[in-house]
Amino acid sequence: MTDAAQHPAQTTPDQPAATPEAGADGTGAVNPQPLAERVDNRSQRPASNAFRDFMASGWAPSSQALPDPDASAPYAARRRAAVSARFPGERIVVPAGRLKVRSNDTDYRFRAHSAFAHLTGLGVDHEPDAVLVLEPTDPGAGDDGTDHTATLYFRPLAGRDTEQFYADSRSGEFWIGPRPTLAGLAARTGLRTAGLEELESAVTKNVAADGTAVRLLAETDQDVDALLAAVRTEAGVDLAAAAEADAQTAEFLSELRLVKDAWEVERMRASVAATIAGFEDVVRALPRAVGHDRGERVVEGAFFARARLEGNDLGYDTIAASGNNATILHWIRNTGAVRPGELLLLDAGVEDDSLYTADITRTLPVSGTFTDVQRRIYHAVLDAADAAFAIVRPGIRFRELHAEAMRVLVDRLDGWGLLPVSAEVALSDEGQHHRRWMPHGTSHHLGLDVHDCAQAKRELYLDGVLEPGMVFTIEPGLYFKEEDLAVPEEYRGIGVRIEDDILVTEDGAENLSAVLPRTPDEIEAWMARLQA
């Protein structure tokens, strides 16, 4: 990384560092330089007018051609219409979020809040500090006959005659590449666009106890939170009621994603396809992983390369767990060895450029073949997954998937003599002994977040009724830890999970990840082919 400030100081970055001044008390003590300015202490930056003038001239004109509309634009407009219908007469403020600091002056790659992406259709790294505002109108006078007009406020491309072009390492074109123009992003999204300098007025105008009610997707952009909190307080708005309204807004925006539209399903298919390619890369890399002290990192790296090649990023931290590490549900350190004879549990997903992610798990024999005990445990988990999938159809309740999978696992555990009670008692609310070896849920919604729709009401999620267009995982598992004295020694250190991404259709379900081998025989043949 170049030796320059990732975060520009309060002064312009081409100014020389401030010179400390002697204290006013006559002691000669030096006032400390403000910390915010010390980012400039490591670099010499030109401050001459000649430099500024030279930087501002001699550039070819930027293209004025406008991009085509995004394929997501009409779908995003329908989602905004649903928000408008739910909250007539109220201003809705949905920030994208801000750049997050990894350490010191180094940021993480930007990833917008999922609600912002859902309502704008924007993916990849669009757009730090942006805010979508839905302004109430008279009934039917808004966009496409809705009750709101939508405007996207963001920081557009700066002219090459400005200091931002070359001096702002967070947003300047010289540092991070071209940014969209107001007209360009309007063409892509179908939204009105405006610069961030207009945001404060748009968010705060007419806010009063008897004025325009404002709903905010809170805890997404701290500056917007602070701005609206100050205005609400000054205007005498009931802060408790406003906080409850904000929570209801987050809830609704989460529930709006429970059923995916055709464009969303298409993007999730792309995420699944890229993820399957990543699993194939891992199988090819397994011989190299076996020869490395931290073979799990070899596995993780092989998958990450595919995620960046075909997608935006990982949908979540990869779980590459070999041997006893596979009994740790969210093992993401991936510092362990990958040893012959062990099982490798790989739980990974590619996030598409649209920000939709897959979430798939396979448990693979490192040596290419399952032992008898590994196969026995694997088949129990596979049977549970198949049983849950078999009942998926519109009209059943989401919670039934878990119950069906648990019935199968309890039957197998009972048959192996592992339960200290009868199968009937184990399945009762007062029992649940089987959850010692399967402590997590069987399913979760999937989409823009790996655990999508997380703020939805219980009656629409766990107790909800399945509808066509819902996408969720089915992922039972069994985990027998090395130190578990309640199971035979031959079971210890074995963890198995099988996870697929399921789309509810009009008359049943489709396993979006079914092309990835699932049975022990299929897995062994697949691995042999890829490693030949």
Question: Language-model features: where?
Answer:
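Active-site neighborhoods and metal-handling regions in enzymes and metal-associated proteins
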Residues: M1-A532
